[in-house]
Swiss-Prot record:
Oxidation of Met-45 and Met-48 by MICALs (MICAL1, MICAL2 or MICAL3) to form methionine sulfoxide promotes actin filament depolymerization. MICAL1 and MICAL2 produce the (R)-S-oxide form. The (R)-S-oxide form is reverted by MSRB1 and MSRB2, which promote actin repolymerization. GO terms for biological process: axonogenesis; cell motility. GO terms for cellular component: actin cytoskeleton; actin filament; axon; cytoplasm; cytoskeleton; dense body; focal adhesion; membrane. This is Actin, cytoplasmic type 5. Belongs to the actin family. Keywords: ATP-binding, Cytoplasm, Cytoskeleton, Hydrolase, Nucleotide-binding, Oxidation. It is found in: Cytoplasm, Cytoskeleton. Its main location: cytoplasm. Polymerization of globular actin (G-actin) leads to a structural filament (F-actin) in the form of a two-stranded helix. Each actin can bind to 4 others.
């Protein structure tokens, strides 16, 4: 562990989960849902010390009486007041540090609106008075974590999926592709197809139950049509899940129909390409000389790549798209759920990175737009 006195803080603000900790650590200290919950009902017990808002795990545990909101949608902050609450919670309750004493490394999805970055920078310096900060691209950090400098990262979280080709440490911006289809859309889709089975999930709290079902029971089929046939002819693929009230529900083909949507977005009524095609298209936008290295270093990262069977399916789909002699290797590190954070921890503790920070002084001289000059 780096010296905690001056260690940089690494905060990976995902659309679904916030991962936070100290640079130099090998895993985040705090991982909690990026949720702000507000009571749906009037408090009647005087002196109960009810709060007007709850953040993270506390909101999750009281979800039955709260309306849950995610301030980050598709990787873009849509509610800055709630976002500030999440950061405040991160620094003061989870990490128990004073942000004015530590440099802060934040992460962002590529191709985000410029205003999003500027506002993040402004809040860090003006609200939390950080001495220095930096905004890094999520996928680039995942590649650092895998110990590579060349490869294409397919990063899929709760809010956004993106493919970023990186060569010798340089991201190739013209070839970055982004798909606004990720874990949250899969959760919504699972809610929908479970309704067809006669199980109704509607509230924001029930959506969290469905997310848990998704995380525990879903998997990616190697051959979708064949799997559908198997599911229709036998009950071998059925699994049961116990709801919080003790009721047990059974799910069958929903287990693989749900994540199939990232390979076939038409399931969600979207016109975009699946993740395999997006990855392929991204490689094809790169110079012909470096494609071979990208095919051989396709790195998966993010929570939505955690489904069993996803690496084999990617291998199969990309092999079908690529030239027949091409060697294709899909790298799916076991810790890929946190690889963005781990990469941030590595980056912020490199001695060569120390001159990259945006200092409070630079911010005061140039204003929020400094972030575009100093952070790729």
């Amino acid at each position: 562990m780096a010296d905690e006195e001056i260690a940089a803080l690494v905060v990976d603000n995902g659309s679904g989960m916030c991962k936070a900790g100290f640079a130099g650590d090998d895993a985040p200290r705090a991982v909690f849902p990026s949720i702000v919950g507000r009571p749906r009902h009037q408090g009647v017990m005087v002196g109960m010390g009810q709060k007007d808002s709850y953040v993270g795990d506390e909101a999750q545990s009281k979800r039955g009486i709260l309306t849950l909101k995610y301030p980050i949608e598709h990787g873009i902050v849509t509610n800055w007041d709630d976002m500030e609450k999440i950061w405040h919670h991160t620094f003061y309750n989870e990490l128990r540090v004073a942000p004015e004493e530590h440099p802060v490394l934040l992460t962002e999805a590529p191709l985000n609106p410029k205003a999003n970055r500027e506002k993040m920078t402004q809040i860090m310096f003006e609200t939390f008075n950080t001495p220095a900060m930096y905004v890094a691209i999520q996928a680039v950090l995942s590649l650092y974590a895998s110990g590579r400098t060349t490869g294409i990262v397919m990063d899929s979280g709760d809010g956004v999926t993106h493919t970023v080709p990186i060569y010798e440490g340089y991201a190739l911006p013209h070839a970055i592709l982004r798909l606004d289809l990720a874990g949250r859309d899969l959760t919504d889709y699972l809610m929908k197809i479970l309704t067809e089975r006669g199980y109704s999930f509607t509230t924001t709290a029930e959506r969290e139950i469905v997310r848990d079902i998704k995380e525990k029971l879903c998997y990616v089929a190697l051959d979708f049509e064949q799997e559908m046939a198997t599911a229709a002819s036998s009950s071998s693929l059925e699994k049961s899940y116990e709801l919080p009230d003790g009721q047990v529900i059974t799910i069958g083909n929903e287990r693989f129909r749900c994540p199939e949507a990232i390979f076939q977005p038409s399931f969600l009524g979207m016109e975009s390409c699946g993740i395999h095609e997006t990855t392929f298209n991204s490689i094809m936008k790169c110079d012909v000389d470096i494609r071979k290295d990208l095919y051989a270093n396709t790195v998966l990262s993010g929570g939505t790549t955690m489904y069993p069977g996803i690496a084999d399916r990617m291998q199969k789909e990309i092999t079908a798209l690529a030239p027949s002699t091409m060697k294709i290797k899909i790298i799916a590190p076991p810790e890929r759920k946190y690889s963005v954070w781990i990469g941030g921890s590595i980056l912020a503790s490199l001695s060569t990175f120390q001159q990259m920070w945006i200092s409070k002084q630079e911010y005061d001289e140039s204003g929020p737009s400094i972030v575009h000059r100093k952070c790729f």
